[in-house]
A protein has these predicted regions:
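Glycine-rich phosphate/pyrophosphate-handling loop used in enzymes and phosphotransfer proteins
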Residues: 1-174
């Protein structure tokens, strides 16, 4: 019996005939109810950071552009309560298996970048010792995506421990 990694309800693994024909072997790690709690970014979003429901460049991106920083992010999901809980459990409580939840989505999203060199966001040695894994490279591993660790990060105060204002003033530490 396989359980949802979020709510621990039993996962129903009924395969559909069409999945067998097209050899769709996407494994489910969370139940349908939990998956529905994650909101995909809609068609209307900031063209720079993918902030949902922004029809043009958002104020945050305008701020960074005025400072000479080009913003080009691509988000798949909104940062809602479900996503906040996901990151809390995945990053801060060390539930490494949760890296499998979005591996398939990441793999699909990165297909158009197959000629690129993927470089995961580094974490400090101290954070790696504490957590036991790098959250970005773990998802890439589960998605079977090749990457290069080209950067190292200095030991500094975690972004999650800073206020928004402090994060905006922070320079890059890798």
């Amino acid at each position: 019996m396989k359980e949802c990694l979020f709510c621990t309800k039993e996962l129903k693994t009924g395969e559909h005939f069409i999945d067998l024909i097209i050899m769709n072997q996407q494994e489910e790690w969370i139940c349908k109810e939990c998956k529905e709690d994650f909101e995909q970014i809609g068609e209307i979003h900031c063209p720079r950071c993918y902030k949902d429901k922004e029809e043009k460049v958002c104020k945050d991106c305008e701020y960074w552009i005025q400072k000479g920083n080009m913003v080009e992010h691509e988000a798949l999901y909104r940062y809602n309560t479900a996503m906040k809980d996901y990151f809390k459990r995945y990053k801060f409580e060390g539930d490494r298996l949760l890296g499998m939840v979005f591996a398939c989505d990441i793999k699909k999203a990165l297909k158009k970048y197959k000629s690129y060199t993927i470089i995961p966001t580094p974490i400090s040695h101290e954070k790696n010792q504490e957590r036991g894994f790098n959250q970005v490279s773990t998802i890439l591993d589960f998605a079977e995506i090749k990457y290069n660790n080209l950067f190292q990060k200095e030991d500094t105060l975690a972004q999650s421990k800073k206020t928004r204002e402090e994060r905006l003033k922070t320079s890059q530490h890798f």
